[in-house]
Amino acid sequence: MKTVWSFIGLHSRQPSGVFSGFEAAEDWIRRNKLSGTLSEFPLDVGTYDHAIANELFAPKKDHQNTPDFIADFSSRLDHFHYEDGARQ
């Protein structure tokens, strides 16, 4: 499975960088002394579908199959928090 790494700043609602590799992402975060979260996401598949296919999540309530729920769903494969460029 191919993945990408997405960085979202501490006070942001959208990614400020998307990287094909962890090392490139972390180098950029350190160099710019950024604070926020670096998250890994599967490529070419939604996180909701990925989580169900890999038995990481199973909808149990009706609302968990709605477009709003699916659009807000996140099952980041891995994630790291940073403060001023340093991993926490």
Roles of regions detected by a PLM:
Residues 1-15, 24, 34, 41-44:
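Short aromatic-glycine-(Arg/Gly/Cys) micro-motifs in beta-strand/loop hairpins
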Residues 3, 9-13, 22, 53, ...:
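Generic preference for well-ordered secondary structure
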Residues 31-88:
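Short, mixed-charge low-complexity intrinsically disordered segments
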